[in-house]
Amino acid sequence: MKAKMKKHACTYPGCSKAFTRAEHLRRHSLNHETISNSQGYTCQRCMTHFSRADLLSRHLDRHAKKDAEAGGFGKGVLETRKRMRRAEDGSIVLRPPKRPSRHQQKTGPPVGAPLSSSGSVSAGSGRSSRSPDVSLHAAQAPVSPPRSASDPVSVSGVSIDDDGTDPDPMLAPMMPGGPFEPYVEPIPGQFDAADGSWGGFDALGDGMMLDTATDFNLPFAATGNYNWLFDVSSLDDAFHHLELPLGPDLVPFANSHGNYASVNTMELSGAGAENVQDSMLNLDLDIDLNGLPAGFVHDQGPDGSSASVLLQAASFVERGNINGSDPKRDFPDLDWMAGAPPIESTVPLRPQLSEDARRGILTLIAQSPPVDIHGQPLNLDSPLLSLSALQSYSDLFFSRFNTTYPLIHSATFDPNKTEPVFLASILSMGATYSSREAHQLAVGIHDGLRNQLFCHGAFSPQPDELWVLQAMLLIDCFGKMRAGPKQRERAQLFHCVLIKLIRRSTCCSIRADTHSDPGLGGLELEDAWKRAMDAEQRKRLAFQCFMWDTEHSVLFSQSLCMSAFEIRSSLPCSPAAWEAHTAEEWSRHASRDTEHAFLPVLKGYITPGSVSRPRDLNRFSRMVVLHGLMSISADLKRRDQTTLRAETPERVGAWTPRMGRAYDLWKADFDADCLNMKLGPVQVSADETRRFTSLKAAAMALYRAASLALHVEVLDLQIAAGASHILGRVVKQHDRERSRVMLSRWLSGPSPAATTASRHAAALLQDAVLSLHDWDQTDAFHFPWCLYLATLTVWAFHAREGCVPKPTDLSSLIVAMTTSNAADLEGLAGQYDTRPLIRAMAQQLATVRWAVVHDAMKVLLNLGV
């Protein structure tokens, strides 16, 4: 089939190459013209030799670009992967790579030394020779001056050969799912990436972009982005060898305080990977290590390596508690569903509002006054708008919202010098954590804020003011996750406007070192602190917008608007540096921070063998990385849905196991980080403990839901369960019938997708039920929606035709599903009555003030009848 599609055959004598497009044949023919008519071309700066003049011209352009970036002619350093060089005697040689590639280690012959007039370079097994006689006229060629760089850099430590032995990893397949054609070189802009530096974070901008159109039309991830991320020459090659270790480096974490639990190295390969993945599903960090048996030893994997102490201890204690009589795990009634009283959160700094700030807010509200419950304009003398009330909204924003989503730097934020529209967006968000009346007031204020912001003089298509973007992000978040359907639909319309403005700013590429100079003091140090925090807020704004966009794509099946590849910033700074009250305190903490670029860290989880994962990531950075993995999964899913797979239908979803392992590797690191905090010698405050508990619950819920979404279409779950509206569209009967058919195939299919998704769902519900006293401390907006998806998954798993489920209480259902292995769980499908679980979750979701969750609650109520 593929041979018939290659209609454009090369007519050069002895060449049997054929191509799918005429343009590919035209570029290929240039190689034959070079053999017949030219002696080759040599760069006079670095002695790199090319077979074609157009390739040399592009190479010289890159020299000029590097010189311009370095500040003058001859100052730029261009590191190229091309290994064909002109030696001092005029002959053409191939410089050997730093280390052989994986392909060469297995089958490829060693690269030769100088090329003789009678020799040629093999283009690989089954390929015709294409190298010209390059040394025939070598003595006549000009001698080049000293080169501009040393040895060529490599992609993930593998030097890439340009003669066809190893395909260039930045060259994309010419056809979806089709063969890679190494002679088709180069698509404009691809050679820029191949000749750029891959040695460090500073070079990501050059290496990741294939062409100008890609650079200016994000967020669409190009093939080269994925080739780099998965460390392959073609994305189709990324998922063929899943039996190889994908997570080999669970090594001990560095301990800044001197005391950590030991975590042994573990290989995730073969059958051992399944065992480890099963253990990861059942991790629970409420661990008393003294309860382990005296004879507790490390289980040996199939290769003799020790498994992780962390994973074994957690899974052992989980099983022990379930079989024991822990009162927290007995559920005689559902009193816990009534919810705990609001916690008294405290924060180190609470910006204080003045009467002038209040007058600015009232003036803004008067331009578009909200209405009360009777439909009358709200009186500006209302107690809900008093100075004390506004101050309470501000306190709630910084103690609840800004703790979960650290966007605004409270130490440098002055509400009395802030634009009223920005301050109003902060206060309205804080009011949603107050009484229902205050929440209703906030919704009314919100309805006019977007117009007020668009009409402000500081708003422009090229925003310079940070507060404009911050206000727009808060307004977008409020409309989507803190209000009703009308506000949500409006927010959806303007979501892409926000992303476009962020792209036009510098927020996605904050690379400046935020460390302080030890020699600074006084006003200089104060200015350095404010500049660093301004950059940090810009960075966090882009990250948070990216995270919310990713959540809505994965958890709601909405279109992904941002790509992980457009985030070129370093990860957020440490909480200590972020929460410092003074410039001196910030300087002390920032000097100990280590910057980590987002994309290389992300690659460390997807392709563990290529990049080492940093062990000193803070918890917010770990959440960013998880969202990066989710974004990659969502985009790969989109590629499956939009790529023509007529020839390779087996590759649809082939990425799922690898991304699932990346999720599990992230969880193992997160668990080890949490365990260290729990067992470390440093005592933390009660407020820090509450924040840690909230973050842990939110992170685990998101991990479970993201893993669940890998194996089931969440829209099918909602539609089959009875949702009346999805993404603003009315669900019709044929939609419901289609979703039920899809779920039936999902349940009865040969793959373990249904079992895997159900195990993640049950684990998520177990975590929620066991965190009885921590429910109200989880301010993450995604948490109730994750519970809803998990409940629907368990319902679908047991709602099989022809099965008569037996009456089951909530605790028995959860325990049965979380303590069974994959094979046993498959046999339990359709055996349990899920109505007690559905009713319990519906009762809990009824307490959430979010229209989307309210609709979800109504779906559960209908299912629980």
From Swiss-Prot:
Impact after mutating W228 to R/S: Leads to constitutive activator activity
CC per GO annotation: chromatin; nucleus
Effect annotated for changing D237Y: Leads to constitutive activator activity
Region: Disordered, residue numbers: 74-168
Phenotype when changing K603 to N/E/T: Leads to constitutive activator activity
Subcellular location, principal: nucleus
Induction record: Expression is induced by nicotinate and 6-OH nicotinate and is subject to nitrogen metabolite repression mediated by the GATA factor areA.
Subcellular location: Nucleus
InterPro entries the record matches: Transcription_factor_dom_fun, VerF-like, Znf_C2H2_sf, Znf_C2H2_type
Keywords from the UniProt entry: Metal-binding, Nucleus, Repeat, Zinc, Zinc-finger
GO terms of biological process kind: DNA-templated transcription; regulation of transcription by RNA polymerase II
Residue ranges, compositional bias (Low complexity): 108-132
Motif Nuclear export signal (NES) in this chain: 285-289
Impact when changing R639C: Leads to constitutive activator activity
Effect on the protein of changing P219 to A/L: Leads to constitutive activator activity
Function: Transcription factor that specifically regulates the expression of the hxn gene cluster that mediates the degradation of nicotinate and related metabolites.
Protein's name according to its UniProt entry: Nicotinate catabolism cluster-specific transcription factor
